[in-house]
């Protein structure tokens, strides 16, 4: 059971299979489907995803973090048809690792506020 000030942070880290890169239509379609989950799946409370910006041996190619208010929301997301569509797309082109952690919403607010100050040049 989550405390009132907690969210589940669902993190996924994708690594392309051999022969796949961002020049692949399959990769770009999987990316677009994943970016659109926030518009299709109401259980998602927050959603951030994108390509890796550096090329290092230990880097992944794409990652996401989704925020959920409850384990039942996370469970509903997992079986949602739009999520399953994305799973099938990524399965064809990548392997991935998942981590679900609890995050304190006060900590999240502090991170967002700090980012706002940086963006304002303070």
Mark where each language-model region is:
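Histidine-centered active-site/metal-ligand motif
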Residues: 10, 80-83
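Structural motif
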Residues: 42-45, 81, 94
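Conserved short beta-strand edge segments in small beta-sheet-based binding/regulatory domains
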Residues: 87-102
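Short S/T/G/P-rich N-terminal loop/turn motif that feeds into the first structured element of a domain
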Residues: 1-61, 69-76, 99-122
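Conserved catalytic core of Hanks-type protein kinase domains
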Residues: 67-68, 92
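Residues that scaffold the ATP/ADP-binding catalytic core of kinase and kinase-like folds
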Residues: 77, 86
């Amino acid at each position: 059971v989550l405390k009132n000030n907690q969210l589940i942070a669902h993190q996924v880290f994708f690594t392309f299979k051999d022969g796949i890169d961002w020049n692949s239509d399959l990769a770009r379609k999987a990316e677009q489907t994943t970016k659109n989950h926030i518009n299709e799946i109401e259980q998602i409370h927050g959603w951030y995803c994108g390509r890796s910006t550096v090329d290092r041996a230990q880097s992944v190619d794409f990652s996401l973090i989704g925020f959920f208010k409850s384990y039942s929301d996370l469970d509903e997301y997992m079986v949602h048809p739009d999520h399953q569509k994305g799973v099938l797309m990524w399965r064809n082109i990548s392997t991935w690792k998942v981590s679900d952690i609890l995050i304190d919403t006060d900590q999240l607010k502090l991170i967002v506020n700090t980012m706002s100050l940086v963006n304002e040049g303070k």
